[in-house]
From Swiss-Prot:
Biased composition (Gly residues): 1-11
InterPro entries: K+_transporter, K_trans_C, K_trans_N, Kup
Lineage: superkingdom: Bacteria
HAMAP family (UniProt xref): Kup (MF_01522)
Coiled coil: none
Signal peptide (from-to): none
General function of this protein: Transport of potassium into the cell. Likely operates as a K(+):H(+) symporter.
Name this protein carries in UniProt: Probable potassium transport system protein Kup 1
Reaction equations catalysed: K(+)(in) + H(+)(in) = K(+)(out) + H(+)(out)
Predominant place of localization: membrane
Organism: Syntrophobacter fumaroxidans (strain DSM 10017 / MPOB)
Keywords, ordered alphabetically: Cell inner membrane, Cell membrane, Ion transport, Membrane, Potassium, Potassium transport, Symport, Transmembrane, Transmembrane helix, Transport
Compartment annotation: Cell inner membrane
Amino acid sequence: MKGLFPAGGGNPPSSYLSRFLPHRKERSPENVTSGRNGVPHRGRMLSLALGALGIVYGDIGTSPLYTIKECFHGTHAIAPNPANIMGVLSLILWSLTMVVSIKYITFMMRADNRGEGGIFALLALVPMSGKLISRGARAVVVMAALTGAALLYGDGFITPSITVLSAIEGLEVATDAAKNLIVPLACGILLGLFLVQSRGTAKIGRIFGPVMLVWFATIATLGLLCIVRNPVVLDAVSPVYAYRFFAEHHVHGLVVLGSVVLSITGGEALYADMGHFGRVPIRLSWFAMVFPSLLLNYFGQGAALLEQPDLAFNPFYGLVPRVLLLPMVALATMASIIASQAMISGAFSLTRQAVQLGYIPRVTIVHTSAETEGQIYIPEVNRLMMVVCIGLVLVFRASSGLAGAYGVAVTANMAITSVVYFFVATRTWGWSTAKTAPLVGLFLVFDITYFGSNLLKFFDGGWFPLAVALVIVIVMASWKDGRAELYKHIVKSSPTLDMFLEDVSRHNVHRVAGTAVFMASTSSLTPPSLMHHFKHNKVLHEEVILLTIEVTHTPQVPAAERIRVEELGEGFHRIVARFGFMETPNVPQIMDSAYRARLVPQVLPVSYYLGRETLIPSGPSRMMPWRKRLFAFLSRNSQSATNYFGLPPGQVVELGVQIEF
């Protein structure tokens, strides 16, 4: 698959994500501090499980705020009669069981890439060369994964808006006077949330787990109290009620299923955040706390509706005693902020992975914690999300309006994940197609049914995440193909490094004191920046370093495998530095490591040479003209290599070059 190389340099397109990765257990947070048989010590496991409550389960944990409400009081609501209430509860129970407990907890979390999860980690497990997978299948898998990643951005725009709105809508239950305050309050909370991102969340993040623990305990208690008063609601455990619901409502039942899907939004976060906490703590927190708390609250809302159908306008807050309404609104608002924070941090992480894998241009990546590699802030993404999230609140003005847009992205991503999982299981792990197809087919039956039910709400807001995904896929595909075209140009116009070194050895080239570091997109060709430097200045430095950054198909690269150095003669050294797709390369740190290990001589001063490309979209490239112009625009506005690679600006020399493509 062409074009799969990092924006700042890397391997040729044909070799990217190409090596076969055997499925094996790697270090992950759950076994860093281990007891017997690799199981974490009890204290460590409980600490990770508590942390997972705050990061992994914020989204799905706040779904009770709006799921039942949307079924019985939304745009396509049904009457809150006993048969419908029991049918909806049965659908919620079995959706959580089949999709979250079985698909994600039991199967998807086995597909870890050295402990990491998520769509890009899953894609990186698929072999991209050889006879294990056909060329057409590779193209389908890559495009599916890119679409899945793009859909996550659409989901990321909606989650903060709908969770914050639904939380503070409890004020309407307390007093009618609060109705006009909902939108301004939601906008103010979102504005504050995005403005504090640049300061990092390491300190405040420590309270996320305890707050969500209180949240789950509270919603479970509220639900249990109602169930005790009306235990008949427990009969909805039987799937017969779900069957009767569809038998009675037919197509309208599918529309309501699109609202039931809101109960599983956030389920994909279990897999995506696996690298932060490990599969054992995530499973523990799900089965010990989250799953039972959600079921108790949903069934409690159902029990309350059986007693008072007029609570349908906001059944969640209908469970709360009036004297506790304001404290509950405050707790729900904190839970919604935590859910939003998890989504924002996930968008930052996803963007960094996409940059490293060469799917989007370089962006500004700020590390907000000296201790934690994953604590990052990306101002470009933060500004975009802030504008879109506040815009959604101003346009839709209520959680019920946004509910139509929510779910489409999640269910489409779930279906895509199932497809990629099939290729990982059959091509990487060696599972037989005959055994894998029925399992994945079962997943897809649920995924496609949920996705289809949400498409029925296309004109009620479902178009929004799909439009966002389409734009992002176009950007990623154009950037990938554009970088591939530039690589072809470099291959055609640059001599091999061996040829250049032969010329240097034959001529008495004047050398100046110091070290010159040239960034090279491939280790076999002469960097264009070196060619232009030598062409115009007619000199070389005493020591010349050719530095290539390789991004691997693994999340991280061990320090011992980071740097490979080769002495080329004539004062030239080649350094190949390998990074995982969840890491950010820092060139001065690479050089310091090489100096400390005495792999290259340290000759001062050090200058860094970069190529500054001016793209002219009028060349022979096969890309469509509008895609060429888009690629040129993205290239002009991408983060500079100086900032992205952490280079000291006073030591950087940029050499311009025009490229027609």
